[in-house]
Amino acid sequence: MIILVRHGEATHHTQRLTGGWTDSQLTEKGRAQIKAAAVKLAKDFAGRNCKLRILASDLQRASASAQIIAEELGFKGEIEHCRFLREKNNGIAAGMTEEEAKKHFCKPASEQELDHRNYPGGETRNEFYRRNVHGLWHCADVDKENLLIVAHKGTIQNIIFRWLGMDMQQVAAFNFSVDVQPASVTVLRINKWHEHAVFRLNDVSHLTQGKGFGVFEFKYEK
């Protein structure tokens, strides 16, 4: 089983900085979001003596989120901080404001260019995918171990794509994506038919009590 948790709201969200390798910290709201996810996860693990590994991106917003979850679960092991779980490398744009980064942005000819670098020193989509996937599949038996992974939107998307058997060429060909909101929880498991199944996807029910599904909150193409 793989439980994927995106970090909570971070300072780069509120200060209008670029994401990527900007090493932003959780906001108070972000900490509360992750705490809510952790409390709900603790209910799943209560009374269960199952072996669990917790892996987290080494960027502060993810590692701090992982620590909050580990404490709520009463996790006794060591959190594994993994550089390969970082968000897509945005090169020289890391740490810049969104306005500053626009001056360095290299627009691709199409959204499906997989070997294009948006910023000098940054990664291509193919490089990003390979880093995430090769790193995780080499350090863990993803079909058999219980893994709780705290990472970033793009990283979680890449893990989901690989779980579904898709490489980046297929993702681009189908123009496919999944939404991954801050502090959301996604659960991947092998089902009773031995299929790679998605049991939860972008679940934010711990943040939306009393609200609707949020169907009008998504960004639609007009």
Each language-model region and where it sits:
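Short, well-ordered beta-to-alpha junction loops that form the rim of enzyme active sites
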Residues: 8, 56-59, 84, 149-154, ...
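Active-site-proximal alpha-helix that buttresses catalytic centers in soluble enzyme cores
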Residues: 2, 6-77, 123
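Generic beta-sheet signal
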Residues: 2, 52, 145-151
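Short glycine/proline- and acidic residue-enriched helix-loop micro-motifs
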Residues: 106-127
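Short, active-site-adjacent cap segments at secondary-structure transitions
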Residues: 11, 61-63, 87-88, 155-157
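Acidic, low-complexity terminal tails and accessory targeting/binding regions
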Residues: 1, 47, 71, 75, ...
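Glycine-rich phosphate-binding loop signature in dinucleotide/nucleotide-binding domains
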Residues: 44-50, 139-146
